[in-house]
């Protein structure tokens, strides 16, 4: 009964059973390639695969899932090596609490629960990404607009590109990216299909998963206000969208006694603060001007590439709610200080900027499409594995 209901729901959004399976198949195939490469690197560096998939922020996520916010052991520290009673509140609760709930199943460890959550969320994200690709490829500027057959292919290509971004390895780690991208993707599907309750609820969820949820909230609220003539459901989306984000900030306020408690924790522990892009500009100029570290140069080039993709998306007239979301993601990351080497990971939710690339690849013969995605999958697997085993600092 549940499967029938799910299929019925997907058909409401123009998603056939066959298309959904293809999206999931493309996604899982590319992610399996990445995991195989990571396994090889783990062996070369005498490290366990489990340790790699749960390192850095993953340790925090699993720690919160196991101990809750109040019971985190003292060895869990912020970016400066400091532990306080409030440090854990830097991490939004959506992902670790979901893992904690799944781990209630007898026999499941928090790590196993996290992997299950990520696989399910990744598959849901893949279907949403595919649908976004189909919709947007048929709504961009007329000179590059896809035919119905090309639109379906463009959606699948977009899924492949999403699964093969340089740091897509985090989709399989105990990180928030898989869950966040699923919620962000379905929120955008809701906006594009004018399904306002779906959009509002997914935005609410995204706001509970990570601070980048403000990008989803902004896109949903603005689109719903513009479409206010759709009636009560549009207004419901406006009300629902920010509740998760604001609710968690209120929880941290209650714990710390400060309305800006969460921001203070971030600034003190990870130097994350709005600076108008000064730190990003400094990183780009210093790295590309005189830097020699491969990982830093690759990250700098990735930042520039994302900005170029944004300009390309604007030129292609990708639907404006999608551009609002992408712009908000970029602004929230590039206009703030913090750990520069985490930018490649944090920019993963800007997958919608790959739409112009997907549309053009979709016009090529099938063999060329498969070859392109195969190369992308291999590069993604290598880059992600290298960042986890060779690069020595947090991502």
Where are these regions (language model features)?
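Loop-to-helix entry region of an early transmembrane alpha helix in multi-pass inner-membrane enzymes
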Residues: 89, 93, 97, 105-127, ...
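Transmembrane-helix motifs of polytopic, lipid-linked glycan transferases
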Residues: 101, 113-140, 305-312
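Transmembrane-helix signature of polytopic, membrane-embedded enzymes
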Residues: 109-112, 130-164, 182, 324
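Membrane-interface alpha helices of multi-pass inner-membrane proteins
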Residues: 163, 170, 184-189, 197-225, ...
